[in-house]
From Swiss-Prot:
Pfam families on file: Elongin_A
Residue span(s) of domain F-box: 24-68
Similarity comment: family membership: Belongs to the ELA1 family.
Organism per entry: Eremothecium gossypii (strain ATCC 10895 / CBS 109.51 / FGSC 9923 / NRRL Y-1056) (Yeast)
Assembly mode: Heterodimer with ELC1. Component of a CRL3 E3 ubiquitin ligase complex consisting of a cullin, the linker protein ELC1, the substrate receptor ELA1, and a RING protein. Interacts with the large RNA polymerase II subunit RPO21 in a manner dependent on DEF1.
Biased composition (Polar residues): 296-309
Function: As part of the CRL3 E3 ubiquitin ligase complex; polyubiquitylates monoubiquitylated RNA polymerase II subunit RPO21 to trigger its proteolysis; plays a role in global genomic repair.
Taxonomic path: Eukaryota, Fungi, Dikarya, Ascomycota, Saccharomycotina
GO biological process: transcription elongation by RNA polymerase II
The protein, known as: Elongin-A
Compositional bias segments (type: Basic residues): 320-332
Cited InterPro entries: Elongin-A_domain (IPR051870), F-box_dom (IPR001810), RNA_pol_II_trans_fac_SIII_A (IPR010684)
Highest taxon above the source species: Eukaryota
Region ranges (Disordered): 228-332
Length: 332
């Protein structure tokens, strides 16, 4: 646009289209040179929408697709060459046939557009692959990579969920009842115990089997009290009083009491006697108490009582005399 001259109608229309390029749906049979600046501002989706409305635009928008290829796939290869010219022709004709087969009826127009779009490089002597074809190829490859990544992510997520299900803690309504029901049909494996535990457990079973009451209870033991010598009642030095004999009843003589013989204190054997072995000879049994002579008859108090016995015989008049009562007090 030159300064000093008012803008033309074509320039004003291009400015309006550039301001509202997102709302552009169809350009009809407008030449590419008029809408070039508008097409360079569009995205890939908008450009495809215009190609569906105007199929002949597909043979002229190589510059717009090349700019989109560099913008959306900056790391990919932007120029690919093929040796056969027929491959490029077949791609263009197939694309036009999909969008609008009525365009192919004008053979002269199609031939002129193809001749301008397909050019041989003077250095490589090859034909350049259309940028539109490269863009679509990269889009499909990117979608395939995303699909593979999503599949791997789903697989890893599924494995994590399965591992969580294995170690998941489930809450039971009645765990005691279910435990009895499960343990009724199978035997639980015995856990590995140490030798010290098994030994103590065996001793506990032996004690329980011995007492038959589950163990020793110190609170239920029987207490037996033994009387000490100081708590025993002291022996009386005097005999208990006896009731007087009735007249006319014969009195039985009391058996004489034998004195308690003091047991000799054993002396400690000497060192030579301790070394001697016990003799194998049989010792004579001790004499029975009945054969021992009582010391009552050798007591001096008996001689003093004999004259009195004679006097009593004369007084009784032939009746058997009463035997005297003799009390022997043995000092302790």
């Amino acid at each position: 646009m030159e300064t000093g001259h008012p803008p033309s109608l074509q320039e004003l229309c291009v400015v309006v289209l550039m301001r509202h390029h997102a709302q552009l749906e169809d350009i009809g049979h407008m030449p590419y040179a008029l809408v070039r600046r508008v097409l360079l501002k569009m995205s890939a989706e908008q450009l495809l929408r215009l190609e569906r409305a105007s199929p002949a635009l597909l043979l002229e928008d190589e510059e717009a697709w090349q700019q989109l290829l560099k913008k959306d796939f900056p790391t990919n290869v932007h120029e690919v060459w093929v040796a056969r010219k027929k491959d490029v022709y077949e791609y263009y004709l197939e694309s036009v046939r999909e969008l609008g087969p009525q365009v192919l009826e004008d053979r002269a127009l199609v031939r002129s557009l193809l001749r301008a779009a397909v050019c041989k490089d003077p250095v490589l002597f090859k034909y350049r692959v259309p940028s539109r074809q490269l863009y679509q190829r990269y889009v499909h490859e990117d979608a395939r990579r995303q699909e593979l990544s999503a599949a791997r992510l789903r697989q890893s997520t599924l494995q994590l969920q399965q591992e969580k299900q294995k170690t998941r803690i489930t809450q039971l309504e009645d765990p005691l009842y279910l435990e009895r029901e499960l343990n009724a049909g199978r035997q639980r494996a015995a856990p590995q115990r140490s030798s010290i535990y098994l030994k103590s457990f065996k001793e506990l079973r032996q004690r329980q089997a011995h007492f038959r009451s589950g163990g020793y209870d110190p609170t239920q033991r029987r207490i037996v009290r033994v009387q000490t010598p100081s708590a025993q009642p002291a022996a009386s030095l005097h005999p208990p009083p006896q009731s007087a004999p009735m007249a006319g009843s014969p009195q039985k003589p009391a058996p004489p009491e034998q004195p308690l013989a003091a047991s000799p204190t054993p002396e400690a054997p000497g060192p030579l006697a301790q070394r001697r072995r016990p003799s194998a000879r049989r010792q004579p049994p001790p004499a029975s108490p009945a054969k021992r002579r009582s010391a009552l008859f050798s007591s001096p108090a008996l001689s003093t009582l004999l004259p009195q016995q004679d006097d009593t015989d004369s007084d009784t008049g032939g009746r058997p005399p009463k035997k005297p009562r003799v009390y022997i007090h043995t000092p302790r």
